[in-house]
Amino acid sequence: MTILSHPSAKIAIVRARWHADIVDRCVDAFVAQWTKLGGSAADVEIFDVPGALEIPLHAQALARTGRYAAILGTAFVVNGGIYRHDFVSGTVLDGMMRVQLDTDVPVLSAVLTPHNFQESEPLIAFFRDHFVVKGEEAANACAQILDARAKLALVDA
């Protein structure tokens, strides 16, 4: 486990509200792990968007403020029968990647697309638990990328 070298870093989380009962597990786990790493829950700001497709634009607006050291986008994209969920997820991830490349603010992803999801209690319970793991992993990755970027800043100095 990495202990934060930047414990006062501000982090934004952009979360989709579709399947909020699942997605919120990621957010809660991120904040819990962030505090275990030495960060403050008060430095994590949460922003809600309707669905996954809105994450990149919202992340871009947040990145452009210069206020956040990193941004996490989280959503649960499932096949709703209207359009292909893998297309939606790919579009969201491409947008998030473009945001971080254009703004130089790391944008992490916990946008998950199960191959086959059905609204059954066993699967819902599985993904609730899985999003806890993903939230913890995202907090660890966030700490690691902030450390890596701090080392890059020393190279540029």
UniProtKB/Swiss-Prot annotation:
Belongs to the DMRL synthase family. Catalyzes the formation of 6,7-dimethyl-8-ribityllumazine by condensation of 5-amino-6-(D-ribitylamino)uracil with 3,4-dihydroxy-2-butanone 4-phosphate. This is the penultimate step in the biosynthesis of riboflavin. It comes from the Bacteria. Pathway: Cofactor biosynthesis; riboflavin biosynthesis; riboflavin from 2-hydroxy-3-oxobutyl phosphate and 5-amino-6-(D-ribitylamino)uracil: step 1/2. The gene is ribH2. It is an enzyme of class 2 (transferase). GO terms for biological process: riboflavin biosynthetic process. 5-amino-6-(D-ribitylamino)uracil binds at residues 18, 52-54, 76-78, 109. It catalyses: (2S)-2-hydroxy-3-oxobutyl phosphate + 5-amino-6-(D-ribitylamino)uracil = 6,7-dimethyl-8-(1-D-ribityl)lumazine + phosphate + 2 H2O + H(+). This is 6,7-dimethyl-8-ribityllumazine synthase 2. The active site is at residue 84. GO terms for molecular function: 6,7-dimethyl-8-ribityllumazine synthase activity. PANTHER family: 6,7-DIMETHYL-8-RIBITYLLUMAZINE SYNTHASE, 6,7-DIMETHYL-8-RIBITYLLUMAZINE SYNTHASE DMRL SYNTHASE LUMAZINE SYNTHASE. GO terms for cellular component: cytosol; riboflavin synthase complex. Its EC number is 2.5.1.78. Gene3D superfamilies: Lumazine/riboflavin synthase. InterPro entries: LS, LS/RS, LS/RS_sf. Keywords: Riboflavin biosynthesis, Transferase. Transmembrane segments: none annotated.
